Amino acid sequence: MQRIMLRGKLHQARVTHAVLNYEGSCGIDQDFLDAAGIVEYEAIDIYNIENGERFSTYAISGERGSRMISLNGAAARKAAVGDRIIICAYGPMTEDEVAQHKPRLVYLDAQNNIVRTSKDIPLQLA
């Protein structure tokens, strides 16, 4: 049996560009892709913290060091510049892989600077 597991996440990224008349995708600073283990053309899910929108697209490489998060094409209608979003990549894993797996979690501040990375999400208390 295989399970679909979170592999990489960019948490609270700020949208820097929304380009409606561009081939669909999400342009992401290559440094962010590397940190989260996401590769160009990989399927990603995006969750908009500001309005609750959830949608899928694919990642494309953005200029390294630019701190860019650009929603392109139809995705540009799902968020505004300045919105906080979560970008996730998932992948199938066997039970043996699941037992060893730790996702690559990248946390960003309001200026899209990486403030920390982790491989664990803290236990949520009641």
Swiss-Prot record:
The modification Pyruvic acid (Ser) is found at S25. Pathway: Cofactor biosynthesis; (R)-pantothenate biosynthesis; beta-alanine from L-aspartate: step 1/1. Binds 1 pyruvoyl group covalently per subunit. Is synthesized initially as an inactive proenzyme, which is activated by self-cleavage at a specific serine bond to produce a beta-subunit with a hydroxyl group at its C-terminus and an alpha-subunit with a pyruvoyl group at its N-terminus. Its cofactor is pyruvate. Keywords: Autocatalytic cleavage, Cytoplasm, Decarboxylase, Lyase, Pantothenate biosynthesis, Pyruvate, Schiff base, Zymogen. It is found in: Cytoplasm. It catalyses: L-aspartate + H(+) = beta-alanine + CO2. One of its GO terms (biological process) is alanine biosynthetic process. Its EC number is 4.1.1.11. It comes from the Bacteria. The active site is at S25, Y58. One of its GO terms (molecular function) is aspartate 1-decarboxylase activity. GO terms for cellular component: cytosol. Substrate binds at T57, G73, A74, A75. It is an enzyme of class 4 (lyase). Belongs to the PanD family. PANTHER family: ASPARTATE 1-DECARBOXYLASE. Catalyzes the pyruvoyl-dependent decarboxylation of aspartate to produce beta-alanine. Heterooctamer of four alpha and four beta subunits. This is Aspartate 1-decarboxylase. It comes from Tolumonas auensis (strain DSM 9187 / NBRC 110442 / TA 4).
